[in-house]
């Protein structure tokens, strides 16, 4: 099984052995997450094509081959049945308050490794119809 081992750009690489498995068939170094090993957090299509629809996948270009970062998905997001706004996915760090389902996609900006992907102002706006008031 492909398991999480050494870190690469904030995400662990996939290697054989160990117990922190994310995707059994994952071969790309960016397709595993250190603390979230559920299927909904790491899509097989992410490893295969560089872009996966639905919860768990973002898109990132790579030289010499396809690379894909897995978007972080908070446990409470999964319980709510939703995940992250489309522009809040490219980050090499755990999600901030902004990246919860209460975040407003229009507030987000691109990010780089080690930086948060969203502005603090995102935190107090809602993007889901069921959200009636700020939660931060």
Curated annotation (Swiss-Prot):
GO terms for cellular component: cytosol; keratin filament. Transmembrane segments: none annotated. It comes from the Eukaryota. Pfam families: Keratin_B2. The keyword Repeat applies. Residues 21-130 are annotated as: 11 X 5 AA repeats of C-C-[AEQVR]-[ALPTV]-[AGHST]. This is Keratin-associated protein 9-3.
């Amino acid at each position: 099984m492909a398991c999480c081992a050494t870190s690469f750009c904030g995400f662990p690489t996939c290697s054989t052995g160990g117990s922190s498995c994310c995707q059994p068939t994952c071969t790309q170094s960016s397709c595993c997450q250190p603390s979230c090993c559920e299927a909904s957090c790491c899509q097989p299509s992410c490893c295969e094509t560089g872009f996966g629809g639905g919860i768990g996948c973002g898109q990132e270009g790579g030289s010499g081959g396809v690379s894909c970062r897995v978007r972080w998905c908070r446990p409470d997001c999964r319980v709510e049945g939703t995940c992250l706004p489309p522009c809040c996915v490219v980050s090499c760090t755990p999600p901030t308050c902004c990246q919860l389902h209460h975040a407003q996609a229009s507030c987000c900006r691109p990010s780089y490794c080690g930086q948060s992907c969203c502005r603090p102002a995102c935190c107090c706006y809602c993007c889901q119809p069921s959200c009636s008031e700020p939660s931060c």
